[in-house]
Amino acid sequence: MKLQKPKGTQDILPGDAAKWQYVESVARDTFSQYNYGEIRTPMFEHYEVISRSVGDTTDIVTKEMYDFYDKGDRHITLRPEGTAPVVRSYVENKLFAPEVQKPVKLYYIGSMFRYERPQAGRLREFHQIGVECFGAANPATDVETIAMAYHLFEKLGIKDVTLHLNSLGSPESRSAYRQALIDYLTPMRDQLSKDSQRRLDENPLRVLDSKEKEDKLAVEKAPSILDYLDEESQAHFEAVKAMLEALDIPYVIDTNMVRGLDYYNHTIFEFITSVEGSDLTICAGGRYDSLVGYFGGPETPGFGFGLGLERLLMVIEKQGITLPIETEMDVYLAVLGDGANSKALELVQAIRRQGFTAERDYLGRKIKAQFKSADTFKAKLVMTLGESEVEAGKAVIKNNRSRQEVEVSFEDMMTNFANISEQLLS
């Protein structure tokens, strides 16, 4: 019997959850500045939603998806990424309709699932923040979305982030490059890893994405996709680069970057940082102008990105960034005797309803243990409430640092705690 969490998952306990909540709140605030609204899609989708969009030959579909047949014999998969479900929702809910303001800007935050070998920053259930922008082919959309991710990293204080940029061009450009890559790699097929030998037949661009040493060696002198861009694709990419420079966002061109999903065209990008000497991708995305059409909607340009929360938080920790998380409690009530139990509950509830954080003792402990709890909670104020205080209708509240104290009536506590707090903490 297994009564532990499944391999590749984690429990996020309150101290850590506060960090998660902070990063999520900064992301929400940043996205709202760019007029993005939140979308929430199911954690599981029909298998075809993912296989059609991500690509039947990708590692995600062939190796990593959690898929099963439900009791109605429907082929279901836990979502391995966020874009396909959002595109499905965009089409199903007819967000392409003329009355819907364009571009449609959406963001999501949630769990994704992939059956991978668990390692630092990579779990089988992982959490992703992502954005999708529908309806604008303008290269300024590409740059605005990239700039939004860059803005988020700045707000979080993340340093040493490098933007890696490439273009996959139009479908025609990509097709021409695909053939050139096949011609280049076929003579050295036996030098490739087993996975890349398969990729050469199914999706040769994925060989460029391989992390295997023999594959990296094989593609060192591979032709560049930028040499196969048609005139329109070149113009789009040049505009993207010019606008990034206008916004003072530095970048490097990475012609071996192809992204692991089949739906991309034109601009693709990754933000990479160094963690303990190793490069780590913390955000990636690009343009996908055919995906809405794959789902039965009208041809609609799209651009988006996803970033892993686990990786982002790991980078924040490794870079020694202190997140401004409020951990102090406003007031702690030490309770002495059964006769004070009911009044303590009444007072602590009244204080909370005035907007303050408050806790009280429920365990009937000795006063010294209760004061220790107040220190653990970093309580700014401490009040001791016993039967004599209940009879008198008032109690002493003290500043837990300066030890300054004041005697206050219960009526004042229940109606005007802000003044009491200000008097003791100023």
UniProtKB/Swiss-Prot annotation:
Q: Between which residues do disulfide bridges form?
A: none
- Enzyme nomenclature, EC number: 6.1.1.21
What GO terms fall under cellular component here? cytoplasm
Q: What are the protein's UniProt keywords?
A: Aminoacyl-tRNA synthetase, ATP-binding, Cytoplasm, Ligase, Nucleotide-binding, Protein biosynthesis
**Locations listed in the record:** Cytoplasm
User: In the UniProt record, does the keyword Cytoplasm occur?
Assistant: yes
User: What superkingdom does the record give?
Assistant: Bacteria
Name any one Pfam family assigned in the record.
Answer: tRNA-synt_His
- Residues in coiled coil: none
Q: Which CDD domains match?
A: HisRS-like_core (cd00773), HisRS_anticodon (cd00859)
Q: Name one GO biological process term.
A: histidyl-tRNA aminoacylation
GO molecular function terms attached to this record: ATP binding; catalytic activity, acting on a protein; histidine-tRNA ligase activity; transferase activity
Catalytic activity annotation: tRNA(His) + L-histidine + ATP = L-histidyl-tRNA(His) + AMP + diphosphate + H(+)
Quote the InterPro entries the UniProt record gives. Answer: aa-tRNA-synth_II (IPR006195), aa-tRNA-synth_II/BPL/LPL (IPR045864), Anticodon-bd (IPR004154), Anticodon-bd_dom_sf (IPR036621), His-tRNA-ligase (IPR015807), HisRS-like_core (IPR041715), HisRS/HisZ (IPR004516), HisRS_anticodon (IPR033656)
Family according to the record: Belongs to the class-II aminoacyl-tRNA synthetase family.
User: Subunit notes for this chain?
Assistant: Homodimer.
What protein name does the entry list? Answer: Histidine--tRNA ligase
